[in-house]
Amino acid sequence: MPGNRPHYGRWPQHDFTSLKKLRPQSVTSRIQPGSDVIVCAEMDEQWGYVGAKSRQRWLFYAYDSLRKTVVAHVFGERTMATLGRLMSLLSPFDVVIWMTDGWPLYESRLKGKLHVISKRYTQRIERHNLNLRQHLARLGRKSLSFSKSVELHDKVIGHYLNIKHYQ
């Protein structure tokens, strides 16, 4: 049978067309903006890379600690612009308390809102970061599995978040 023959020194060609067709959403559909209230939203960023560790790619996301689900996520550099994109996705939601770590841009962006800066109140999202690292090898710090393109990096991680949190 032609499908069972060994490759004899040639690696099989991977077809990434199915991954490139993915169109993951960036906001959950489980929580209805305007009708549901998010009491405690934890925000954090997670480091990843594409091709080489010098080409950093950051995942910013918000986590509803009571529903134990990701509310929204964006990819980009670790800048105010990326944080602003995440905040614009979260603007339709009624969030009572924001909980973040001590990154200074959170404090400047959440000025005027009820904002708690504490490692104690970001334990759930930090645990979720660890779960993402365990489930997705491309997010591991020391791994042979890494993303070769920004497009596939964003789509694969976005698709994982869609399956686990948004549907």
From Swiss-Prot:
Transmembrane segments: none annotated. GO terms for biological process: DNA transposition. GO terms for molecular function: DNA binding; transposase activity. Keywords: DNA recombination, Plasmid, Transposable element, Transposition. It comes from the Bacteria. The keyword DNA repair does not apply. Belongs to the transposase 27 family. Absolutely required for transposition of IS1. NCBIfam families: transpos_IS1 (NF033558). This is Insertion element IS1 protein InsB.
